[in-house]
Regions:
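Secretory targeting and sorting signals
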Residues: 2-31
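Extracellular attachment/recognition segments
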Residues: 32-363
């Protein structure tokens, strides 16, 4: 039997390879991407006197702000009880705040502001360092900032909770909290966290829990010690995508950690949570000092009026703040402080919000 050469075999393989490349190249060209870079210009010193505040800002040279935070230096003597975070919020220009009518207050914010307050004590050691998380994505190209606000807390040892909710058809990627004025020394935000505008989460009063997917709102809680003030305000900010993206390509996952303390006077505590490789990029985070169980019950403040935040920032697994220019950090850390009085039953809470644009929506 004669053996004839199998003509066209090489050509056939070439055609098959060309066809596969035709399919693969467009798939690669249309792959969804998201990367973040930390921008932090260093500390702003102050406040230099009691009952005053200081502002600082970090600015994204490329991309948009998806979240941000602050870290404070407080010194080591008894004056350290005074410095506290007064706000961590998105900004249109790094100098002004969104504080007017609630609703969608801005688009494509690329700046982050961090505020510190001195309370009744001040020190030359006080400072506040801002952190902006700058997102670059070929899917989320535009963002919108939603603000909500409420008057209070206005009476001693009380709190005020307010929630900002993303518009339908958008994705929550971050948020922030703010209280004013700094002249009321014991007023401060004691919580800033992702949540859901649904009955299961009491429309923002219960925080998103570890492993929950796709929160759509951000809650801020203002707390006050012995001070009072009729003009006190608490602001919540949600940073959301626009509604022109295909939600099937996007999912977010919450990672949460709660640790006991600080319980004794003039002490601090930290808590850290992080995103795993399969959950996508860390795009924002939140922090609280609370009475505990914040993901199963309505948020409750710590028992005394002194507990406050000294930081909420991107970090490594050990809680060391991410440096300026860090690409794609995986962890978020909360730094809390008891103030000048014991506060038994206090807890430190931290949230990391992880964005996945490759594997899409998770049930």
């Amino acid at each position: 039997m004669s053996m004839k050469p199998r003509r066209g075999t090489a050509a056939g393989k070439a055609l098959i390879l060309a066809a596969l490349l035709t399919i693969a190249v467009p798939e690669a060209a249309h792959a969804k991407t998201a990367d973040v870079t930390v921008v932090s210009p260093g500390p702003t010193m102050g406040p230099p006197t009691p009952f005053t505040g200081v502002s600082s800002h970090a600015d994204c040279p490329d991309g948009l702000v998806s979240g941000g935070g602050a870290d404070q230096a407080i010194g080591s003597d008894e004056m350290s009880n005074g410095n506290h975070v007064m706000g961590m919020v998105p900004s249109a220009d790094g100098a002004t705040e969104y504080v007017d009518t609630p609703g969608v207050v801005g688009t494509d914010a690329a700046h982050w502001m961090a505020f510190g307050g001195s309370g009744s004590r001040s020190s030359d050691a006080f400072s506040t360092t801002p952190y902006a998380i700058c997102l670059s994505s070929n899917l989320i190209r535009h963002t919108q900032v939603v603000m909500n606000k409420a008057q209070g807390p206005s009476t001693g040892l009380s709190s005020k909770l307010v929630t900002a909710t993303c518009p339908t058809g958008t994705v929550l990627i971050g948020g922030g909290a703010r209280t004013t004025p700094a002249s009321v020394g014991s007023l401060k935000p004691i919580a800033s966290f992702p949540t859901f505008n649904d009955a299961d989460h009491h429309f923002g009063a219960i925080a998103a829990g570890d492993g929950e997917h796709d929160p759509d709102a951000w809650t801020a809680v203002g707390g006050i010690g012995g001070g009072r003030g009729a003009d006190n305000m608490t602001y919540a900010y949600a940073i959301c995508s626009t509604d022109d993206i295909d939600l099937k390509h996007v999912s977010t996952t919450v990672r949460f950690t709660e640790v006991s303390g600080p319980n004794t006077a003039s002490t601090g505590q930290t808590a850290t949570a992080g995103c795993t490789r399969g959950e996508g990029r860390l795009v924002s985070g939140g922090a609280a000092i609370s009475g505990g169980n914040v993901t199963t019950t309505d948020f409750g403040k710590a028992t005394s009026g002194g507990p406050h935040l000294n930081g909420s920032f991107p970090s490594d697994a050990a809680g060391t703040p991410a440096g300026d220019g860090t690409a794609n950090p995986s962890y978020w850390t909360a730094a809390t402080h008891s103030g000048g009085s014991p506060s038994q039953g206090s807890y430190s809470d931290v949230w990391a919000l992880c964005l996945d644009v490759r594997h899409g929506h998770k049930p």
